[in-house]
């Protein structure tokens, strides 16, 4: 037998017959059709809409609307405080690749942003990053270093 589209059949037991509700008691789903005896869920025009709570004020109307809109393409940074640079040698060049190699940063997935938390004791560092906070910029330059912004 050749395999053709008009000769395909489902395996035995793979497809189940549709239940015909309300077609007599011999069919097994006659009379109340498995909907119970009385109540809103047994009436015609069922079921109620999603989120309907029986007339109680529904949850999606009780919760306040959000006052902001999420950014479509937010910028993600690998953030690092200036205090993390204290273990580096004086006069060294600091960029994302060197930080990954030294084990200070685990992944070079996102661009580097320097934050100004903590004190900087390392001297004359050349820091290359995508962004600097104003406090990080002043602390690095006060220690005799330079800040290069990468694009």
From Swiss-Prot:
One of its GO terms (biological process) is translation. This is Large ribosomal subunit protein uL15. InterPro entries: Ribosomal_uL15, Ribosomal_uL15/eL18, Ribosomal_uL15/eL18_sf, Ribosomal_uL15_bac-type, Ribosomal_uL15_CS. Part of the 50S ribosomal subunit. Belongs to the universal ribosomal protein uL15 family. Residues 1-57 are annotated as: Disordered. The lineage of its organism: Bacteria, Bacillati, Cyanobacteriota, Cyanophyceae, Synechococcales. Pfam families: Ribosomal_L27A. NCBIfam families: rplO_bact (TIGR01071). Residues 25-37 have a biased composition (Gly residues). Coiled coil: none annotated. The keyword rRNA-binding applies. Binds to the 23S rRNA. GO terms for cellular component: cytosolic large ribosomal subunit. SUPFAM superfamilies: Ribosomal proteins L15p and L18e. Residues 12-23 have a biased composition (Basic residues). It comes from Synechococcus sp. (strain CC9605). One of its GO terms (molecular function) is rRNA binding. Keywords: Ribonucleoprotein, Ribosomal protein, RNA-binding, rRNA-binding.
